[in-house]
A protein has these predicted regions:
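Active-site acidic/histidine proton-transfer and metal-coordination neighborhood
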Residues: 59, 76-139
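N-terminal pre-domain/capping segments
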Residues: 1-92
Length: 139
């Protein structure tokens, strides 16, 4: 089945009188949509009660959730600390996604900065392998 829906709350969400994320399932149903990407671009900060309401509403309406991990993830940074922090942010995103019943996490690898694409791809690949191992270990 093809799933279509917004990433975050659009202007029409508030224009239609909705105020908070737990109301998203009702809004999506009215719009004929069946997917929603929860935005954590500026950090994984969730309200547990609100997320559980979102999950219940989406499950009741067959709406599939995904979660967008923080934008500041940098899998290809030349700084080891930034790469390790990126793994931590991915783990935090996975924990939040699990809580809300999201089936996917969207992660951008970051830029090449001052290194070649080949070097950046190599670093990103290695960091992603470490993140996947950490996710396996966490479950």
């Amino acid at each position: 089945m093809i799933r279509i829906g917004p990433a975050g709350n659009s202007e029409s969400f508030t224009a239609m009188g909705y105020k908070s994320t737990p109301q998203i399932p009702e809004y999506l149903e009215k719009m004929g949509l069946n997917a929603y990407e929860y935005q954590c671009g500026r950090g994984v900060r969730i309200n547990r009660e609100g997320v559980l309401k979102l999950k219940a509403g989406c499950e009741a309406r067959d709406i599939q959730l995904s979660l967008h991990a923080p934008y500041y993830i940098s899998l290809s940074s030349v700084e080891e600390e930034k790469r390790q922090n990126s793994i931590k942010y991915i783990l935090e995103s996975a924990e939040a996604a699990d809580l809300m019943g999201a089936h996917r996490i969207v992660v951008h690898s970051g830029s090449c900065a001052k290194i070649s694409r080949e070097e950046a791809l190599s670093l990103a690949g290695e960091t992603l392998k470490q993140a996947l191992a950490a996710l396996d270990e966490a479950h």
